[in-house]
Amino acid sequence: GRELYTAWQIAEGAVLYRDVDGFYGPLSQYVNGALFRIFGPGLMVLVWANLAVFAGIMLALYLFLRRGWRPATALAATAVFILVFGFSRFSTIGSFNFAAPYAHEVTHGMLLVLLLAHVLWGWRHEPRPWHPGLAGLLAGLTLLLKPEFVLTALAATGFAGWERFWSSGGRLRRAEVLAWLAGMTAPTVLAVVYFGQH
């Protein structure tokens, strides 16, 4: 009920933390509020959006596993993930799955962290100028979710940065550091400005 009510209130113009309580960061609630504003409020709007997020998670997981495994093995591992975690009900309350999660911050966070893993892998193996900025942005978006995803994103990014530092002879390019910092701080700055005006 909380996920539906909060998104509905935000779609009607309420401000999170002022007009309606929120337990976690604002990103997921405002994404859901935007969906309700566009498609109208309703459980099935969130279910379809959640299934799209789940499809993104499955694709990201498969592609990530594919980097180290054969296609059949990566597909089998992704299928196990789908069967065990996708639509399971381990309690009488059916809200601990991807179609109707207890907190959308979990599903959105998982997708962001998997996308971050792809970007960091690319930064390590096929560096592009946009990798550090995008990695910072994805890590910065996790700051607007739940703490466990913030820790995961920062640990992964820190490890990748450390590895990049040592593999480049003990130095990082200033442009990479600045791009990462800009991406990392942008979501929080935008959130602070938004809530400061409301």
Language-model segments: what does each one mean?
Residues 168, 174-198:
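Transmembrane-lumen/periplasm boundary regions of multi-pass, lipid-linked membrane glycan transferases
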Residues 108-134, 161-171:
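Membrane-interface transmembrane helices that cradle and orient dolichyl/undecaprenyl
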